[in-house]
Amino acid sequence: MKNNLRYGIRKHKLGAASVFLGTMIVVGMGQDKEAATSEQKTTTVEENGNSATDNKVSETQTTTTNVNTIDETQSYSATATEQPSNATQVITEEAPKAVQAPQTAQPANLETVKEEVVKEEEKPQVKETTQSQDNSGDQRQVDLTPKKATQNQAAETQVEVAQPRTVSESKPRVTRSADVAEAKEASDVTEVKGTDVTSKVTVTESSIEGHNNTNKVEPHAGQRAVLKYKLKFEDGLHQGDYFDFTLSNNVNTHGVSTARKVPEIKNGSVVMATGKILEDGKIRYTFTNDVEHKVEVTANLEINLFIDPKTFQSNGEEKVTSSLNGSKTEKNLQIEYKNGVGTYYANVNGSIETFDKEKNKFTHVAYVKPLNQFKLGTVTVSGTVTQGSNPNGEKPTVKIYEVTNDGKDLPQSVYLDASDKNKYKDVTNEMQSKLTVQENGNYTLNLDTLDKSYVIHYSGEYLNGTNEVNFRTQMFGYPEQRYGYYYNSYQLTWDNGLVLYSNKADGNGKNGQIIQNNDFEYKEDTLTETVTGQYDEKQIIETEENQDNTPLDIDYHTAIDGEGGYADGYIETIEETDSSAIDIDYHTAVDSEAGHVGGYTESSEESNPIDFEESTKGIVTGAVSDHTTVEDTKEYTTESNLIELVDELPEEHGQAQGPIEEITENNHHISHSGLGTENGHGNYGVIEEIEENSHVDIKSELGYEGGQNSGNQSFEEDTEEDKPKYEQGGNIVDIDFDSVPQIQGQNNGNQSFEEDTEKDKPKYEQGGNIIDIDFDSVPQIHGFNKHNEIIEEDTNKDKPNYQFGGHNSVDFEEDTLPKVSGQNEGQQTIEEDTTPPTPPTPEVPSEPETPTPPTPEVPSEPETPTPPTPEVPSEPETPTPPTPEVPSEPETPTPPTPEVPAEPGKPVPPAEEEPKKPSKPVEQGKVVTPVIEINEKVKAVAPTKQKQSKKSELPETGGEESTNKGMLFGGLFSILGLALLRRNKKNHKA
């Protein structure tokens, strides 16, 4: 009896435990069902780091492709890059990101997951979750727990992928080592080392030319030399290869700009080579990967050479050289600097020393010196930013240097070497009581006596976004009396203007095939194009696209096409090679400068790499003065250079006294021209219309004419069919004399209307057109005519040599000429270009099938990684899994990304599952959505199975094998327990 009771109690306990355990297994496995798909995917992980943002949020980009088979186990690859720490606890939550579909077909589906790591030290728990939304709409929670790692072995990451579940649930973890070391190493390579291919460069043509192809350069007039190269490269260029050439130390490529860059070499919109300036005048161009597999590569380079004011300080002849692969190009140039503005007893000169466009700052150097041993009394020197001043800027810095040896050794190039203490003495502190500096950028220096030469160094800023900067140096004073003579006061003004230029660079290439290692060959079919256009403040105006297979011609041309006129000022040039977007003065490049330019004009040249050909034509207008005015016993001498660069022709007012032409060429064009109202004298001059190769219909309106006609008035009609040479006739013309205009008033000369309709004409005559004449449309003419007024129309159909005729039909209506009012003393020409603009061509990458993957960012503080989260046991007696040890080499763990269907672009519906309720709700607003991109640098791991599932809208699923077996196992436990309990009851009854 006792044995039966003892066995019954044991069976009761065993049965109850079995029922409880089976129920827990069934419930737990039911909450965590996952459909195992039969698709094959390859898992690779690539990690890179970028700098953290200001708010300490770093982004880690992980490119993964998951391997899923119909087996029960799922494998994930990751590389641990985060160092766990027991002292620091970090919670990272992900914000939602957009999902993009893959762009090209790959053997495996590629995903890019961007996660923003936000560090919060207030929360004690260690937790790292990733919420993502895939195409099926379900959400998953990813837990990352680092495993053990020694210093001599790579750190590994355990990746757990599970659905939301209860706290007491514990799911077995499926892990495997990261086997993508090769892909990671390839992605970590940030710089490709190439070889020096200077020896493989052949100089076919080279030259150094002065301004306008002369041997003369005036640096203060904005002039510079140009280095021209035609280069040929041997085949087999690779990414990272470079070539160098060296310039002489008396020239540079930047002018007064603080930027030390050279423009990129482009083939259309593709960068073929990047340039940079090295020490000792060396320039290096490094090829990009777009030069791979290119053959017959040639380059045309035109680089500006600015005279260095530090090296060459005086007027004279200077030799400029450039060397490339043993080929030396040289030129003797005549250098001439300006002397500023002055009188017999004083002189003022200056220049803009540097110009920093990024910081909106510039420096200026001014010379103030007496001449001929005069002592000047009550002298006032002022510096003013007349254009481009920043009223809200900081106070400028002004330093004053006293020059020894009476200023005779001052460089003509207007250069200050403040470190030369023997030549320049800093007297700024002594002049503080006499110096006034204002916040708007102006300064004033008052001197009781000027008997020494001074150099004033100014450092200030200009208004951001301005298109012109002008700095004015002015001196006013009285010279001392000599020999009983009293000298008048004087005022000297010297303006330093700044003009910005832009470099251009374009080119095209020729594709070829190169056999490598005799094992395989590369044949590239990339797009070759040349895109040209015009840049100004309104961005792209016009583009032109040419597609061909010509050699790679790179054109760098930044020289001014032509400068004419009288330039008295100091015009400096800036060549700035900033690769960022240019926001100042794309329209201020000067093709032609005309007029009297007095003052110091500085030119800034921007050589940012663009593949559009700029139109650098402009109009320079301005008030120019170079005079001396004596008024009220005072003498004023002013030299100024006010340059305004205008894209559009200005309105003109006044009298038109010259021929006004309108020329239209080579197009079917309807031109409406007519004279409007003119104020002033009614002398039109000559109105000339030239139409080439066109069939012309002319409608003339002569209208009403009032006044007296004192001469013979005649109307002559010639309709003869046969005439000798130099006579008229040949056509029958119907004339309606009712339409002859009324003529009234006084005309001293013969008034005649002559019509020539002959068919045959001798040489040197024009004709060949049929013209309809309507005399009703004759315009009204009022006033006195003191000479013969002749209206002659020629309607010949046949002409001998030298005739002008055509095949295009053009209608001219004379009464639609634009209104011209005002006074014009020259010939006004209006040219109309009817070439239709070509829209810009979008940029096409040379290798669209291999886009560059995004670079993931490294956490800003790798010393505070996230330690693993211990799991909560379901029962008190259940042992807790051991916590992994801290790896010795910290790395950032990368969570696996949600799976993407094998066929991108088609949505995958979710598998039929029961609703799942997570035990811990995830914070709203902080989720991560995978961004699907293509990473060509990641080497995919070979799939475990060769056969992939066919593309379809609904992927094949392998059934719920692992979870069903668990539920079956739990159910058997429950049934066994119930059986034992029932048997126990029977024993009790017995």
UniProtKB/Swiss-Prot annotation:
Stretches the record annotates as 5 X tandem repeats, Pro-rich (WR): 851-920
Ranges: WR repeats: 851-864, 865-878, 879-892, 893-906, 907-920
Location of Pentaglycyl murein peptidoglycan amidated threonine modifications: 957
Biased composition (Pro residues): 836-910
Annotated region described as Fibrinogen/elastin/tropoelastin-binding, given as residue ranges: 194-511
Origin: domain of life: Bacteria
Chain segments carrying region Fibronectin-binding: 512-834
Ranges for region 2 X approximate tandem repeats: 545-604
UniProt membrane topology term: Peptidoglycan-anchor
Residue ranges the record assigns to the propeptide: 958-990
Region (Ligand-binding A region): 37-511
Pfam families, sorted: Big_8 (PF17961), Fn_bind (PF02986), Gram_pos_anchor (PF00746), SdrG_C_C (PF10425), YSIRK_signal (PF04650)
Protein name: Fibronectin-binding protein A
Taxonomic path: Bacteria, Bacillati, Bacillota, Bacilli, Bacillales
